[in-house]
Amino acid sequence: MNQPGLWVQLDHLSGPQRTLLQHLTFGVEPGQCLTLIGPSGVGKSALLAAIAGTLDMLAADDTPPLHCQAQVWLNGRCISGLPCHQRQVGLVWQHPTLFAHLTVAQNLLLAVPSGAKAQRLRQVSQALERAGLAGFESRHPATLSGGQASRVALMRALLAKPEALLLDEPFAALDPALRGELRAWVLEQAKTQSIPVLLVTHLAEDIADPQRVLELSNV
């Protein structure tokens, strides 16, 4: 599919006991946001993981992995068979995964493209300031609140300059005022950088565009 943006043709997403999703086709154009809604357990998070190439990471030690048969295109290239680190997709979970042994700045530096150290540190400081976390460079994840950790994870995803951004309820742990401010900032950055965004939420106020909502239901 030789089109800009993120395009998905899913045949099925299933576990050992049942099929979660099937026969699903959708696309998100550059700079736009498509919101995914649906009941708990329908497969919203699993769909994001399948697009990002991290579906096998969702399975617990005693849980059989999910299986997905789908074709995914990103800016004209098929990424379905690529490992996650080659897909150029940013993924932020509701419960952020930060490296506990690294400081906030070190976590963010992992996502900054190569360059002079001073320049990279400046990018990190600017990102933290935009997220309302100025001065948090030397903090460790264990000292952060849930909302602060979510903001660091969002900044890390954007600093990596992804070609698509997948968000799994990343604003849920934030207070209402900050949630609205950060959501608007993230979507504005995505629009400015022409990044397609796929957002999972259960909050009506998180819906960026009522005309761009995909409701998932159980098979």
Where are these regions (language model features)?
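Catalytic Walker B motif of ABC-type/P-loop ATPase nucleotide-binding domains
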Residues: L165-E169
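ABC ATPase NBD coupling module
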Residues: L66-C68, L74-Q94, S114
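Conserved ABC ATPase signature
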Residues: H140-L144, Q148
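ABC-type ATPase nucleotide-binding domains, specifically the catalytic core motifs of the NBD
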Residues: D56-A59, P83, L102, Q106-L121, ...
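Conserved H-loop
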Residues: S194-T201
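Conserved ABC ATPase "signature" region
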Residues: Q119-F136, L187-E188
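A short, proline-enriched helix->beta-strand linker immediately N-terminal to the Walker B motif
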Residues: L159-E163
